[in-house]
Amino acid sequence: ITTYNCKDGIKFSTVIQDESSKATPAELALPLVYGEKNIVIGDHRQLPPMLDKEEFINTLDFLIDNVTGESEMKQLRKLKTYVIKNFDEMEISHFQRIYESIDPSLKGKFTRQYRMHPDINEVIKQFYEEKDDNDSANGLICGLIDPIDLGVNDPDMSNPFSRYHGIQIDDFICGEALSANNHVIWIDVNSPEMIEGTSRVNEGEVNVISHILKKFSESDSFKQYCDKWADEDDKEIGIISFYSKQRNKIRRMCKSFNDLPLKIDVVDRFQGMERNIIIVSMVRSNTIISDSQQQPDYSEYELGFPEQHDLGFAQSPNRLNVALSRSKRLLIIIGNSELFRQKSIYDNVYNIIKANPNGKIIKCNPYEDICK
């Protein structure tokens, strides 16, 4: 790539932009004016520039509560209504719009990934299945085993292509074991969600995560696993939530596990990161409560609590893709299958894990099965 001066300023023969899906339109456009040729690289199936709906609406609510002029208040309320109604459209990155509209002769794509175990790859490859010119679907290929197996299950984790974890816990949760052959697990919980401001929390899922962390902290095989890594990022268990209030709840709970290396955040802030072990808290449920002390009432409600059917943030395929694709060796999903399987992308995830001989679907009542 050459750089040269001209009367209009600096010019480049070629400009390469990476992580372009996270760029705003201005950030994407500005470098283009300096290049004769432009190569824009990104993943149109991941999240756009960070735009936190909760923070956005909370800020608007603050302004509405503090503004003095009637005209300004009316405009802010109008903006809030627009954001709530059109947030899905706002979450489409400029890179995605360009990629989907540009002439096919001007674009290409990588179809192999080398991050994750093939069992995890199977779960996320649906997000990359697009019809080609022959009308046949294609998806994401795991380069660790295709065209040849590079040692993906090699117990020697110094092999850079190994995605073995070696953790063995006989009584992991609800009477089920975790073995070294397990790489994808869905823990199916039935606990209700609760509204906190503009956010959501699920106390039952926090209990499940606490139980899992306790099992890891007591496990000799997990300690041996950690000893194999010099880098703290490799040791860390990543915990991802779709909601900031749930993240905060998990962080408070995790103060009891200071001995464990943990990274806890919302899915948007995990984009671009990876960890060997990832736990995903889905939060949303098919039942909802208004108070954390609310008890089930089966005389009034079939499921004990009022029903709800909204997936909220979790309905975004790009957000789900980011959450599930952070893991290299072990992915644990904690969520209510009765709600999420109503949407095909989640039903696919569930069925892929269920059909995998080494996958696990574990039914769990977080108030009974793990809190006796």
Region roles according to the model:
Residues 1-30, 265-268, 282-283, 288-322:
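Conserved RecA-like ASCE ATPase "motif II neighborhood" in helicase/translocase motors
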Residues 216-266:
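Conserved helicase motor "Helicase C" RecA-like lobe of SF1/SF2 P-loop NTPases
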Residues 50, 54-108, 254, 287-372:
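Helicase C-terminal subdomain and adjacent C-terminal extension
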Residues 1-129, 354:
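ASCE P-loop NTPase helicase motor core
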Residues 110-215, 273-275, 322-328, 332-372:
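Helicase-core coupling region on the C-terminal RecA-like lobe
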Residues 16, 39-41, 186, 240, ...:
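Structural motif
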Residues 2, 21-22, 44-48, 54-56, ...:
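Conserved nucleotide-binding/hydrolysis micro-motifs of P-loop NTPases
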Residues 26-69, 159-207, 277-294:
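Metal-dependent catalytic core segments for phosphate chemistry
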